[in-house]
Amino acid sequence: MSIDTIVAIATPPGRGGVGIVRISGPNAYAIALCLNGNKALQPRLATFCSLYKGNNEVLDQGLVLYFKGPHSFTGEDVIEIQAHGSPVVLDLLIKESIAAGARLARPGEFSERAFLNDKIDLIQAEAIADLIQASSDTAARMALKSLQGDFSKKINQLNEELIYLRMYVEAAIDFPEEEIDFLNDGNVSQLLQKIIGRLEDIRSQANQGVLLREGLSLVIAGRPNAGKSTLINNLAGRDVAIVTEIAGTTRDIMREHILLDDIPLHIIDTAGLRDSDDLVEKEGIKRAWQELKRADCVLLVVDINNPDQQNSLLNELRLTLPNKIPIITVYNKIDTTKLTAKCDEHTVYLSAKTGEGLDELKKVIKQVVGYQPTEGQFLARRRHLQALDEAKALLLTGQSQLTNHKAGELLAEDLRLAHQTLCEITGEFTSDDLLGKIFSSFCIGK
């Protein structure tokens, strides 16, 4: 439990009908009495009060709500003052609260206290920020599922199975004189494989959540005049890039953000890739390659009337980019041929000018990045994926120790490390540095 009391404005900056000031800590109730002229407050009831300055001058009127700890969001005594949404009034309430003994809260400190007081776990704390920042209806619903504990329950169930397996393995090590060889009776191997399978399922679901939360960096590349800028204009539904018949019109990076079936898509148009003596164009090409190396997915746009462009540039991309970055080849300008729009796993035929084939392109993008919306989906972060991948690697190492070497002690250690890694997701075992990084990204007042 914290020894100091914090205060912050909990509503967005600017003017509004209502503004909320939140106070949390051991002196929250006493500070509220200083502000409302010593008018008694009942827990979990809204009380209409005049709000005073230190000189007993009325500064506003509003509702004051008292949540007595531990039955509050933070687990501490919490006061919420609903005043008129004037920045001046809210600032005065903050100043009076500080004068009465509070200090200004750090970003995310209310949620941090809720976590430290076991009111929420780390996944739920992150979900609060994700819900506030959600970019679509689906992302908001999935963030709410994480806040309600859907993701946490899956991790906790996995940990329970892992704890049982650890007990089984360590019992086999501690009691080697037993007639039954627990490590070789097949039960340990079956339990371990079941846990690995469940972890893979959770990882797949979490990946969908990461796509919804963070979106994709989609870089459009190709030779000059292949139709890249026309394509980004069509995807955006408006003219964001200059389009001319002159090759090399695009010199710098062009960015646009859209939603693709609720996935935030960060589209990046780049300069045409070719050898050039023009200093400005060379810089644009250099930046294009930098963006390509950071991409989640690359669209290689090829003029269908010049298909020879495709082979040399595709080979160059494959040699230069990491293998994990998928490349979709887009044959553009089918409106100048007798071809119709079509697609397969990594290839699309379309017309960026007319929009024919655009739906096929969107379908292929979702397939290539593995987006498959399912029931029970929740929002997740990249750190969750990293922890799940690390835990899986440890379990596979332990499986190898069991299968190839019958090394019970080494298996037990890998299981322990995997368990600890999974606990980092919910915050049961988490470094102070990680906590500071997570909560500092929150809004003040949350």
Swiss-Prot record:
GO molecular function, one term: metal ion binding
Binding site for Mg(2+): S229, T250
Residues that bind (6S)-5-formyl-5,6,7,8-tetrahydrofolate: R22, E80, K119, K446
Compartment(s): Cytoplasm
Residues reported to bind GTP: 225-230, 244-250, 269-272
Chain positions recorded as K(+) binding sites: N225, T244, I246, T249
EC number: 3.6.-.-
One Pfam family this sequence matches: MnmE_helical
Cofactor(s) named in the record: K(+)
GO annotation, cellular component aspect: cytosol
TrmE-type G domain residues: 215-370
Keywords: Cytoplasm, GTP-binding, Hydrolase, Magnesium, Metal-binding, Nucleotide-binding, Potassium, tRNA processing
Top EC class of this enzyme: hydrolase
GO biological process: tRNA methylation; tRNA wobble uridine modification
Textual note on the cofactor: Binds 1 potassium ion per subunit.
Record CDD domains: trmE, TrmE_N
Annotated HAMAP family: GTPase_MnmE
Family affiliation: Belongs to the TRAFAC class TrmE-Era-EngA-EngB-Septin-like GTPase superfamily. TrmE GTPase family.
Function: Exhibits a very high intrinsic GTPase hydrolysis rate. Involved in the addition of a carboxymethylaminomethyl (cmnm) group at the wobble position (U34) of certain tRNAs, forming tRNA-cmnm(5)s(2)U34.
Quaternary organization: Homodimer. Heterotetramer of two MnmE and two MnmG subunits.
Protein name: tRNA modification GTPase MnmE
Organism, scientific name: Legionella pneumophila subsp. pneumophila (strain Philadelphia 1 / ATCC 33152 / DSM 7513)
